[in-house]
């Protein structure tokens, strides 16, 4: 239904293009079309500058339609076709109207789901309609899905934390109830103990009264005992008289026993004499047996020594015999060989003798003169020689005969030696037989010795029996003597016993008194220990109460933190609402501007350019707004991290509660020990009761048991003292833990202060968001200035400034202190410091829980990436560049300045300036920043360019002829073409020993020029320099970072190579003919356009960034006629770089952990006025900086493609 050949234009990005209806009218209708053509000619340069992905189409109006006659009735075929196209345009317009009416019926709920708000309904409907036409987005997308899922996740997290808090509160309540219950138990036990102690004191008083009564009884008992003792004395005197008569009888018996003893003593003397004789005999026999044993031992040792020596000698002799036999065999073999040789020599002797005889005969013949031939003389000479040889052999024969004789002598000697050895072996065998006989004799003597030992033992037993009988007799005599002494001692002992009994009773009374006093002292000590224990128990209770209060405070702090996070999220939502309202305002303004332009122009071409301008502006608007949204989302993520760290603090509180449980367990153990002590006291009381029962019995047993009990009590008191000491030590430990808790409180107060500081920083953030809104308004004013006016020109002639993408932040020490990210990083570091102090104090964390820094690293890396798109930072950094952008552009050709239009990414403004030099056919590309201090401060574009020399491999492709144009104007002709060369260069880091050739000693460069493809230029290029303009293609540069290497200043030159690397770190790449060093004016055949990429200032210690520069320049250079071959040179010259990179760059290279956020940076033109910025003719530049975490290599992909006349509907692709 639609014809796209002349009517509409479809964009690669999906933007709507309006149809172009032809205007057929009379002379009055011809004027607007001519005005449109003029506007088109004036804005031809601007048509080339588009966003990335747009497709340029050159629409050629038919000549017949312009030269149309005024005859309305006689219509030609072309007129009919034109009418048909008008009808199609009207149909297209009708369809658009139908579509607009449909979109007006869309519900506000759909718009809210798609755009996030339904407030400016008309604007959103228009946007919805354009989106459906362009098919930019899927209609089913819902903006609220992701935030709702995040909200649900937050609610789940909140529920979980609430449940955990409830568990903690329940645990605390349980602990509190348990402690209250234990305190009540302790009170009851204390009252029971006091009652028991009162009962015990009453018992002791009763015991004292009982002991007094016992003393009185003892006194009466002593008086009675004295009377009984007097009676016993009388009885004992009577017994003494009887004992004296009994002693006389014993004396008589004693005399009889003495006589018997005299007889027995004579017998004993005889027996002793016999014993002495027997003992002497035994001594003599034992002495002989000892001597025999020693002799036997010596003989055995000698025998063993000789046997071992003989065995060794026998083995040696056998070995010698074997050696001699083998030697004899060898000598015999030699003799056989020599005898054969002697036979051979004898045969030769015989032959020699024959030869001598023949010689003699010949000599005789010669002397007689019978034979005078020369042949005979030769034979004679040969025979002489042979004779001489034979004589030499005779000498050898004599030598061999002498050797044979010597060998015979040696054989005889060896035979003689072997006979001697055999004789020695026979002698040894005889000696062995003698030794065996000696062994038999030794065995006999051993058996005799054993018999003698047995006899000796029998004699010893007899003597022992006799001695025993003597001892029995002596003991009987001694017993008789002892009986007399005993009778005398009994009287003395009875008297002593009486005195001892009296003194012992007195001692028992004294000991009882001492025991009572000691028992009272022990009871006092036990009471003191109980009091101390209760005091320590009270301290433990205080500590537990403090712990509970601390946990409550921490819970309150948590709730306050959550409320603050909630308020922050609310503020973020409000800011998002403000942003949306600002976006709606911007959309309304753009719509009103579009309506004004439609009313002013009324022509489709102007309308198309307005749409293009709107697209460009839309890309420029979205960048800062996307920046703000991303910044707010990053703030939300940081707050979430903060919440996680607070959860870590909550885990530490749980640990303190675990320690509180351990203290409670220790308290229970101490209570058990106290109960054990009370049980021991009860046992003591029980034993005292037993002692009272024993006192009623015998006095002696009572006193012994009392002493035993007293010792037991002393031992128990020592044990009690040791336990008291242990209790004191534990109490000291508890006090130390209380000190640790106070330290925790101090750290907690520090954390509160940090939190207050964070609140102030958040307020500062709110102020900075207001600055953001102001900057939005400024950007809107700037976009109004960029819109084209009625004559097709822009309201303000904007300088050549492009927005490059740079993902690394710019360093600024003064500005770094003011950013919220720096504050959050510092607060994280301080919290980590506090936690490490806590761990040093003694609260050790478990091994499975990693540190806070490992789980939540500081935001330093994010800071380095985010810094360049923080708006208040960007205002300061880009301040000096604003006046430079509005200045005139130096060194510019006749055409419009080359403009670089960028993709809508974030970044700091860089300025790429292209300056052509028509005399030398060169072009210079310069990349600068607003100020030299800030340029490349985060190593943005080419971070490691300066101190490294690249290694570039060039692969030329075969020449490609320029295509013939399908339709071309007669004025254009292919007079100038570009060299069809494809360059593929690979540069990687190489070790010095791995390099070869001209690049052996030079380190690898981080720059890789992947492909440089230059094709033939279209015929439109080769026109006169004054009248025609050159359409430009695109050049794509891909730069990825690589590691730096230490530079070695070298100068390499190869005559056959197209690359020369010089000491000034310049890389000259030749596309076509050989490189020429002469800087003179170039000839028409070999002119070389040069692209110079010159980074002005590169500073160190920042992360390598990625960037994209998309450039479709409308800088039209006039080309020279007659140049059929062009030599292109790319010179990449780093001015200054630094040699080091900081530690923060490591994390930036890790692609898995962090993704570097790109920043949008406008580039000013004017740091160095002498280095004008450039694009080579026929190419537009697209620079892509891509980070690689693994290879860290840098690629520069250069593609040159010139648009030919055949590709009228599409441009070159980067």
From Swiss-Prot:
Coiled coil (UniProt feature): 192-581, 624-778
Modified residue annotations for Phosphoserine: 138, 979
Keywords of this entry: Coiled coil, Cytoplasm, Cytoskeleton, Phosphoprotein
GO cellular component: actin cytoskeleton; cytoplasm; glutamatergic synapse; nucleolus; plasma membrane
Domain of life of the native organism: Eukaryota
Bias kind Basic and acidic residues: ranges: 32-47, 61-73
Start-end of Polar residues biased regions: 1-15, 1141-1157
Biased segments, Low complexity type: 1126-1140, 1169-1180
One Pfam family in the UniProt entry: CortBP2
GO biological process: cerebral cortex development; corpus callosum development; modification of postsynaptic structure; neuron migration
Annotated spans, Disordered: 1-73, 875-898, 949-976, 1104-1192
Subcellular location, record wording: Cytoplasm, Cytoskeleton
Main location: cytoplasm
Record-stated family: Belongs to the FILIP1 family.
Summary of the function given for this chain in its UniProt record: By acting through a filamin-A/F-actin axis, it controls the start of neocortical cell migration from the ventricular zone. May be able to induce the degradation of filamin-A.
Assembly notes: Interacts with FLNA. Interacts with RHOD (in GTP-bound form).
Name used for this protein in its record: Filamin-A-interacting protein 1
Lineage: Eukaryota, Metazoa, Chordata, Craniata, Vertebrata
Gene that encodes the chain: Filip1
